[in-house]
């Protein structure tokens, strides 16, 4: 694997609030994408009491070549997960929470009903908390993402992940145009929803391909785009083609704003839920 340039070196996770967040997550039996995906921002986010909770278990039914989450045969759903999640959010006094999940192709609805139960439980136990959901694509799960849109989270996030040319090699079980369709439809079903999508760079894409993804997302009326550097989790994962410079990320940000996105987060360490609360407040101010 390539050695990381200096702009990608994050501080090691330490601190009293970090440990408190970790203990609360473990106490309530929660999984976080911060841990499972080895996110470089875990120290900064957890010290701000920001965490992205991963529901539907910790085992994914897919094996995308960029992702560090375990794959295999998942366990049964935990019926207490929505309540435990809401209690943990209340204990941590989170004003903003991001809920994501593994892919559950084994479930009839892909786990959509569990997302809805989590939204409802949070609204009941800690109604002041803003809820962002980051869902899988629910491919071939009729009515799944539509039902979540009706449940009215504050933000509906679904990552496009990469330019379409790379799908066959890196995420062969996903479909680029299905993801665009999902993003377009949730906005049509619930026009009040703020929609968001994320793109990784450094996998071999061209600038022209990145700009085309921006155009596709704007055609789907996506409000907010995140662009970040792909980092290879282990030697067995997809290789990094190159490290995109901070200056190039700034250029992408400028172009994305010129194309009509309300909020753009574009930097080497940007991830889907990095600074999510601050960006949500900016997004509301733009509307």
Swiss-Prot record:
Family annotation (PROSITE patterns): RADICAL_SAM
Catalytic activity: [[Fe-S] cluster scaffold protein carrying a second [4Fe-4S](2+) cluster] + N(6)-octanoyl-L-lysyl-[protein] + 2 oxidized [2Fe-2S]-[ferredoxin] + 2 S-adenosyl-L-methionine + 4 H(+) = [[Fe-S] cluster scaffold protein] + N(6)-[(R)-dihydrolipoyl]-L-lysyl-[protein] + 4 Fe(3+) + 2 hydrogen sulfide + 2 5'-deoxyadenosine + 2 L-methionine + 2 reduced [2Fe-2S]-[ferredoxin]
Cofactor: [4Fe-4S] cluster
One MF term in the entry's GO annotations: 4 iron, 4 sulfur cluster binding
EC number from the UniProt entry: 2.8.1.8
CDD domains hit by this protein: Radical_SAM
Associated pathway: Protein modification; protein lipoylation via endogenous pathway; protein N(6)-(lipoyl)lysine from octanoyl-[acyl-carrier-protein]: step 2/2
Cofactor info, note text: Binds 2 [4Fe-4S] clusters per subunit. One cluster is coordinated with 3 cysteines and an exchangeable S-adenosyl-L-methionine.
Occurrences of domain Radical SAM core (ranges): 46-262
Subcellular location: Cytoplasm
Sorted UniProt keywords: 4Fe-4S, Cytoplasm, Iron, Iron-sulfur, Metal-binding, S-adenosyl-L-methionine, Transferase
Residue numbers binding [4Fe-4S] cluster 2: 60, 64, 67
Annotated residues for binding of [4Fe-4S] cluster 1: 34, 39, 45, 273
UniProt-listed SMART domains: Elp3
GO CC terms, sorted: cytoplasm
NCBIfam families membership: lipA, PRK05481.1, PRK12928.1
Family designation: Belongs to the radical SAM superfamily. Lipoyl synthase family.
Protein name: Lipoyl synthase
Provenance organism: Wolbachia sp. subsp. Brugia malayi (strain TRS)
Name of the gene this protein is made from: lipA
């Amino acid at each position: 694997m390539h050695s990381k340039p200096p702009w990608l070196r994050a501080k090691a996770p330490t601190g009293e609030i970090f440990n408190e967040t970790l203990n609360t997550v473990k106490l309530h039996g929660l999984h976080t994408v911060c841990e499972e995906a080895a996110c470089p921002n875990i120290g900064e986010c957890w010290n701000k009491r920001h965490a992205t909770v991963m529901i539907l278990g910790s085992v994914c039914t897919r094996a995308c070549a960029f992702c560090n989450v375990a794959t295999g045969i998942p366990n049964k759903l935990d019926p207490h997960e929505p309540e435990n999640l809401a209690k943990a959010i209340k204990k941590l006094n989170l004003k903003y929470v991001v809920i994501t999940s593994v892919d559950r192709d084994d479930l009839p609805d892909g786990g959509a009903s569990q997302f809805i139960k989590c939204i409802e439980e949070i609204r009941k136990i800690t109604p002041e908390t803003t809820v962002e959901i980051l869902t899988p694509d629910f491919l071939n799960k009729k009515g799944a993402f539509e039902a979540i849109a009706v449940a009215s989270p504050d933000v509906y996030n679904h990552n496009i992940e990469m330019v379409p040319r790379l799908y066959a090699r890196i995420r062969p079980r996903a479909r680029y145009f299905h993801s665009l369709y999902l993003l377009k439809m949730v906005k049509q079903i619930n026009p009040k929803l703020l929609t968001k999508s994320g793109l990784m760079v450094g996998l071999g894409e061209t600038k022209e391909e990145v700009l085309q993804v921006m155009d596709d997302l704007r055609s789907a009326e996506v409000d907010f785009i995140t662009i970040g550097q792909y980092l290879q989790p282990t030697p067995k994962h997809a290789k990094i083609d190159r490290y995109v410079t901070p200056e190039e990320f700034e250029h992408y940000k400028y172009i994305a704003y010129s194309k009509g996105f309300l909020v753009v987060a574009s930097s080497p360490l940007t991830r889907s839920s990095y600074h999510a609360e601050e960006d949500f407040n900016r997004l509301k101010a733009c509307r």
